[in-house]
Regions:
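Active-site flanking loop/helix segments enriched in acidic
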Residues: 1-8, 67-76
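Post-HEXXH active-site segment of zinc metalloproteases
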Residues: 47-72
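A cyclin-like helical interaction fold
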Residues: 86, 104-108
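Histidine-centered active-site/metal-ligand motif
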Residues: 2, 39, 82
Length: 198
């Protein structure tokens, strides 16, 4: 459901960019849409060629490194690895394709890493990688059922230890912190995307 919302938002961002500025080529469109559809594919167990489901071993996306998950662990347990796993999936599926440039898609997906790294190359908000991130964030936070999903999100955070990092003790902490999270963390990265949506 999240990927569908992100793809819909991203398509409208691209449409707005084309209307306002022009210059969005068919190749740009193709790579952008594939990036949107694949941005969270790294959460899916078994999607990378090295994954060994029966042994609960999964590629991290960093070389030959594998991570062992406990039986019954949810896909959220792959959160620390999902961007690198997604880039590995893209390389495995599109690396030899003559039409699709896997490097463009991997760069777009890299900018969906969250929390956003402080490095300069992750600060883009205007170009396609930054707009993929904007679509990801807008798609998630504009989900009409987002507030109802906060409980499940909290338990995903708990499974990965992210709740302690964020200092959330229970699901209501997420709900009460939502405005601060939006304005301080999300808004700086979506302003250009919002401009194309208006």
């Amino acid at each position: 459901e999240h990927t569908i919302l992100v793809a819909l938002v991203g398509q409208e961002i691209l449409r707005g960019k084309q209307i306002r500025e022009g210059g969005v080529s068919t190749d740009d469109w193709l790579h952008f849409i594939i990036s949107l559809v694949c941005h969270d594919i790294g959460y899916v167990k078994g999607v990378c060629r090295m994954d060994r489901d029966r042994e609960h071993l999964y590629a991290t996306g960093n070389g030959e490194e594998m991570v062992e998950l406990s039986p019954g662990a949810s896909d959220a347990s792959l959160t620390p690895y999902h961007v690198d796993r997604g880039k590995l999936f893209i390389e495995e599926r599109f690396g030899k394709n003559r039409i699709i440039d896997a490097e463009i898609i991997k760069r777009n997906v890299e900018l969906t890493r969250f929390p956003v790294p402080k490095e300069e190359d992750h600060q883009d908000t205007r170009y396609f990688p930054g707009l993929v991130r904007a679509a990801d964030l807008i798609g998630q936070l504009s989900d009409p059922r987002y507030l109802k999903k906060i409980g499940a999100l909290f338990y995903e955070f708990e499974e990965t230890g992210q709740n302690k990092y964020l200092n959330y003790r229970h699901p209501d902490d997420l709900k009460h912190n939502y405005p601060k999270f939006y304005w301080n963390v999300v808004h700086p990265y979506i302003q250009d995307g919002l401009r194309y949506l208006s």
